[in-house]
Amino acid sequence: MRLDSISIANFRNHTLLEFEPGHSITNIYGRNGSGKTSILEAIHYCALTRGFSGNNDREYLKFGEELFTIRSSFTSGQGIATKVSITYSPKREKRILVNEQELQTFSSHIGTIPCVTFTPREMVIINGAPAERRRFIDTAICQYDRKYLSDLLLYRRILQQRNALLSSEQDPRVIDSALDVLTDQLVAIATEIVLVRKRFIEHFTSMLGGVYQWIPEGAEPSILYQSSLGHHENLYEKDKIQQVFRERFETLKQQELQRRQTLAGPHRDDLQFYLNKREIRKYASQGQQRAFLVAMKMTLQGYLYEASGEIPITLLDDLFSELDEVVSGTMVETLATKGQVIITSTEKKKGKGISFFSVDDYKSSKEP
């Protein structure tokens, strides 16, 4: 996948900006606060229908303005053109058109433009709350597996209904009967989600080991998927997983009624990251944690290509600020051999064949 052009108006601190990246590496450079990251966020909007920081569209609207627009053009590896147009105003909410057809559901667009990002704020994947790690794995899988996306949305709806029932003041007999129905529905979808996640992590970890060879010290990376199945985590048979879930919910029933929330399921699962069998969050330096996340993003690029047949666009925000120059340079060179890479930095980076865009004066150039 390749971004051919993008124009943004009243987006973050940009009144109007037009950007045409190169086919390989493009370095967006400029002073801090000049809006480099905003360009990447606009591209991310076109790929995943939201910015880096989530679904609060209002925060991307330039102060004092009533509407922001993003217009972009992409070309797939098969030469298929895709045009994405996004408008947002607090009065009319967000509208997304793909090839001039308005999306009825934003989720239907996920996977059309595969995209891998690295931003400093994503360090929360390593050292933040479990929800951040679940978001990483869900966003990755949803870009190539539409059934998983559908299952995830259905699971969230059933979970919301089940939590509402647990919090209701209805007759206990009514709650008990309805709870059995919702639990059966939740177990069926939860099993599908857990199986896909486990298979993803298993293959992803094997690929991560190969990518990690370019990082110094020859460390051995691994990822552990922690599910609410407890000591049954190694199960891969659907019927057995369903049985364990049913037993788990039966055991937790009184606690759930008391706490008024669902206490088991994929929404409570987590990932643990290791280097040489030592948990990264506890024992690794900040530099090692950052390098591990970068390696994960490199792995994800290859994984999405393998799963979908389309090379993702790679967006790297402020990659060089805290990462070893050799490691970051190797990463960029490796990614560039596989697709389009767009990087932000405060200073212009040297490199053969790199395209440049100065966000301070909106000028483009290219190294010979």
Curated annotation (Swiss-Prot):
GO biological process per UniProt: DNA replication; DNA synthesis involved in DNA repair; double-strand break repair; SOS response
Record's keyword annotation contains Zinc: no
Gene3D superfamilies xref list: P-loop containing nucleotide triphosphate hydrolases (3.40.50.300), RecF/RecN/SMC, N-terminal domain (1.20.1050.90)
GO cellular component: cytoplasm
InterPro entries tied to this protein: DNA-binding_RecF, DNA-binding_RecF_CS, P-loop_NTPase, Rad50/SbcC_AAA, RecF_2
Residues bound to ATP: G30, R31, N32, G33, S34, G35, K36, T37
Primary location class: cytoplasm
UniProt KW keywords: ATP-binding, Cytoplasm, DNA damage, DNA repair, DNA replication, DNA-binding, Nucleotide-binding, SOS response
Superkingdom assignment: Bacteria
Family: Belongs to the RecF family.
Chain's role: The RecF protein is involved in DNA metabolism; it is required for DNA replication and normal SOS inducibility. RecF binds preferentially to single-stranded, linear DNA. It also seems to bind ATP.
Cited NCBIfam families: recf (TIGR00611)
Protein name: DNA replication and repair protein RecF
Origin organism lineage: Bacteria, Pseudomonadati, Chlorobiota, Chlorobiia, Chlorobiales
